[in-house]
């Protein structure tokens, strides 16, 4: 059986925590920020965990992460 390929696009966007969960940054912080409040922009700086419903699919495209 051949080696599994890691999705490089996904590997750059996700990190694995010590418990095996996937950590990601929130979207919406790159541009069009003038109409967003300070509170919204502050909350977008925080990392969050991947939703459990997507985690199974992500583990397939990140086999060695």
Swiss-Prot record:
Q: Which UniProt keywords apply?
A: Ribonucleoprotein, Ribosomal protein
**Gene this protein is translated from:** rpmI
Q: Name one GO biological process term.
A: translation
Q: Please, which domain of life does this record's source organism belong to?
A: Bacteria
Q: Which organism is it from?
A: Lachnoclostridium phytofermentans (strain ATCC 700394 / DSM 18823 / ISDg) (Clostridium phytofermentans)
PANTHER family recorded for this chain?
Answer: 54S RIBOSOMAL PROTEIN BL35M, LARGE RIBOSOMAL SUBUNIT PROTEIN BL35M
Family the entry assigns: Belongs to the bacterial ribosomal protein bL35 family.
Q: What Pfam family is a match for this entry?
A: Ribosomal_L35p
> Lineage of the native species?
Bacteria, Bacillati, Bacillota, Clostridia, Lachnospirales
Provide the GO MF annotations for this entry. Answer: structural constituent of ribosome
Against HAMAP family, the record matches this protein to: Ribosomal_bL35
InterPro entries tied to this protein: Ribosomal_bL35 (IPR001706), Ribosomal_bL35-like (IPR021137), Ribosomal_bL35_CS (IPR018265), Ribosomal_bL35_sf (IPR037229)
- Name used for this protein in its record: Large ribosomal subunit protein bL35
Q: Which parts of this chain are annotated as the region Disordered?
A: 23-44
One cellular component (GO) term of this entry? cytosolic large ribosomal subunit
């Amino acid at each position: 059986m051949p080696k599994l390929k890691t999705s490089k696009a996904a590997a750059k966007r996700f990190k694995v925590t010590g418990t095996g969960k996937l950590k990601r940054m929130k979207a919406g912080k790159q541009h069009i920020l003038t109409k967003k409040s300070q509170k919204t922009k502050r909350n977008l700086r925080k990392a969050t965990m991947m939703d459990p419903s997507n985690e199974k699919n992500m583990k397939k495209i990140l086999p060695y992460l």
